[in-house]
């Protein structure tokens, strides 16, 4: 039996009319998936299968319910009988191999955790930074993509953790702009959900400030979604909140913390930002900061995207034909030029980390607070708050991965399982056998390779 499937990104449901038949277990499961409530969805689809074991639609959606919860063994167990019976069912030929790959990564992560030290003692630092990946708290485009509480509670579960640092950094994925001008990125006849352009209201600037963000990157593929006017309005909004920023070509953030002059520059693989793909130009910009600042931080938005982009390849990355950078070349070049810390974001998944010449390189911190328009299933719902300790000379003296995950439509909460630490540990062992950072069971990071 095969039903038409509701898209997982559906955001509204039609309530049954008075006197209508009560929703079936399948309907209840789909409603739960729409709300990204994996636990309820699993219960509903299990009930559906218990009533009709041959119901392929229930089995298929049960796999997606497990997917939302990162229960990869259960995804594979749910789908393998379906694939054997109906190899062409929906997109199972594509998605079952992806689930198997995620299961292999999860199994490796669990094995690596078991063999890791319990903890690493922190070193003596003059600057303690906490950093997160992509943030977009809700968008005015399309209409109705704001949270019911107008994003007021976005950071409630993580605010105290973000505030507990000398510097707190994040990637601002899209402009803060009240200008109603249309986006050149989206065609007027584009189907709903087919074009991803973000524009958050300027009032959200106060939410970032209240959560403790001192500096953000505006160098990313959504910064220009609504043109130069919105980029400028974003910069003015951040300035008014006292939040430092770097994004457009030549822009850097510089300020003083604990008596140390800090310089930060954000790069992206688009020439409308400090340009990641121009290695010589990037080196020159970093050297300018090194000449006048005590500690220099580089952030970059680069790499392919999605659950298949967890590994850092050797060489250039392409995403839908776009050059998303040779990240190993770029990161090593900026450290050689004097950068003390390199923070990556953009793939929407966590990646491994490297210690290169005593400097930490985190290749992707994943999604952190991305409301409504983002796929948060599986690995894309796992994030981190990366703590980094830096000495007066910029050397890495220790750190910690504080795991997060997103609930519902995209609200960050602390993850007691710290799946992020386990993922980073396994991905690091796979991708950086020589220079990989060492991560203990509690998420602390050693200052030595």
Regions found by a protein language model. Give the residues of each.
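Alpha-helical tetratricopeptide repeat
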Residues: 22-33, 60
